[in-house]
UniProtKB/Swiss-Prot annotation:
The name this protein goes by in its record: Imidazole glycerol phosphate synthase subunit HisF
Family: Belongs to the HisA/HisF family.
InterPro entries assigned to the protein according to its UniProt record, in alphabetical order: Aldolase_TIM, His_biosynth, HisF, IGPS_HisA/HisF, RibuloseP-bd_barrel
GO biological process, alphabetically ordered: L-histidine biosynthetic process
Known partners and oligomeric status: Heterodimer of HisH and HisF.
Broad EC category: lyase
Organism: Aliivibrio salmonicida (strain LFI1238) (Vibrio salmonicida (strain LFI1238))
A Pfam family hit: His_biosynth
Catalyzed reactions per annotation: 5-[(5-phospho-1-deoxy-D-ribulos-1-ylimino)methylamino]-1-(5-phospho-beta-D-ribosyl)imidazole-4-carboxamide + L-glutamine = D-erythro-1-(imidazol-4-yl)glycerol 3-phosphate + 5-amino-1-(5-phospho-beta-D-ribosyl)imidazole-4-carboxamide + L-glutamate + H(+)
Catalytic residues as annotated in Swiss-Prot or TrEMBL: 11, 130
Superkingdom of the organism of origin: Bacteria
Length: 257
């Protein structure tokens, strides 16, 4: 059995790490490089960096910090934000990232997934999906431009359908960002993850809702995800990654130590 991954997520805005609640009201957490170093030292398996306003601003990730991060950590990391072309992706990978993640640009141009997978290999290509449960319709809907409160909008895609579509086009991994749970810290949406897992045949990473160690145990025991991504519990030092791994190992969950 493959070890379950613990993945801190760093939302980047104007060169600093920020964190919001349900994708709104972002506060500054700190500088990118020291945080990346801290998480690598604590035992994170991987890091994910989202330049959260790149897509809505119509620009690509600022690459200067990508190279600085690559210099100071020795674990894999993934970078997302406004990657619209193979050239954009190539530059980020050249600067030292191990994977690139696309979200809004994939919705605007689904062919991009195939192009990147063909050029760099599926193992490098992650698709982020921002999924919102609409209580009125009872459906999970994919949202776009979620880094900008004024531009964020529902797309025509239901979550399950988009998960199937991106796999057909060459996504090597899917990060499911569950918007209703984001930053609220009351647990992952296990029902949604199980629904997505039924149609997801590539590694699936849960994102949104971690508040205490038991939430990680629950998501691994009850949904068969490959990894769990979290932000505020790590940024605010509510949970230490080393201690989390000890706890999960005691719960008979396979983790890298």
């Amino acid at each position: 059995m493959l070890a379950k991954r613990i993945i801190p997520c760093l939302d980047v805005k104007d060169g600093q790490v920020v964190k919001g609640v349900q994708f709104r009201n972002h506060e500054i957490i700190g500088d990118i490089v020291p945080l990346a170093q801290r998480y690598a030292e604590e035992g994170a398996d991987e890091l994910v960096f989202y330049d959260i306003t790149a897509s809505s601003d119509g620009r690509v990730v600022d690459k200067s910090w990508v190279a600085r991060v690559a210099e100071v950590i020795d674990i894999p990391f993934c970078v997302a934000g406004g990657i619209k072309t193979a050239e954009d992706a190539a530059k980020i990978l050249e600067f030292g990232a191990d994977k690139v993640s696309i979200n809004s640009p994939a919705l605007a141009n689904p062919e991009l997934i195939t192009e990147l997978a063909d050029k760099f290999g599926v193992q490098c290509i992650v698709v982020g999906i921002d999924s919102y449960f609409d209580k009125e319709t009872g459906k999970y809907q994919v949202y776009q431009f979620t880094g900008d409160e004024e531009r964020t909008k529902a797309t025509k895609w239901e979550t399950k359908d988009w998960v199937q579509e991106v796999q057909k086009r060459g996504a090597g991994e899917i990060v499911l960002n569950m918007m209703n749970q984001d930053g609220v810290r009351n647990g992952y949406d296990l029902e949604q993850l199980n629904m997505v897992r039924e149609v997801c045949h590539v590694p699936l990473i849960a994102s949104g809702g971690a508040g205490e160690m038991v939430h990680f145990a629950d998501v691994y025991k009850k949904t068969n995800v490959d990894g769990a991504l979290a932000a505020s519990v790590f940024h605010k030092q509510i949970i230490n990654i080393g201690e989390l791994k000890e706890y999960l190992a005691q719960q008979k969950i396979e983790v890298r130590r």
